[in-house]
């Protein structure tokens, strides 16, 4: 699968411009439910367990106001990335102690190890650029968010 095809891994229904819950676990469940509602997750409980287990191993608060909870799980059959943002920011235990305002949840099938790493590294690289983060924070539509991601994830 071409993991750089944003419209496939992050269709519009996986993008939320609503304020997510203010806790890390609440925000993770909010992102997961976007994927569940879009029919991308076969087993919500298994996906949530995988995300929280991964979160327990090491923080997914990567700094710069970004949180990227992620997991490999058989609860999904294709790579899935959900997006939400928080005006206030959510404590994701980032190394720079900054709250996460941009949230990306990555779920890939257990056998899709390469996809997982490709998506994570492409997102991480693009989000290091302040102008990209600003565009995502200021986007007024789901389509704009998707367009920004499509532009920067190669």
Swiss-Prot record:
Originating organism: Haloferax volcanii (strain ATCC 29605 / DSM 3757 / JCM 8879 / NBRC 14742 / NCIMB 2012 / VKM B-1768 / DS2) (Halobacterium volcanii)
Comment block on domains: The PTS EIIA type-2 domain is phosphorylated by phospho-HPr on a histidyl residue. Then, it transfers the phosphoryl group to the PTS EIIB type-2 domain.
SUPFAM superfamilies in alphabetical order: Phoshotransferase/anion transport protein (SSF55804)
GO biological process: phosphoenolpyruvate-dependent sugar phosphotransferase system
Subcellular locations according to the entry: Cytoplasm
Gene Ontology cellular component annotations, sorted alphabetically: cytoplasm; membrane
GO terms for MF: kinase activity; protein-N(PI)-phosphohistidine-sugar phosphotransferase activity
Name under which the protein is recorded: PTS system fructose-specific EIIA component
Protein's UniProt keywords contain Ubl conjugation: no
Modified residues (Phosphohistidine): 70
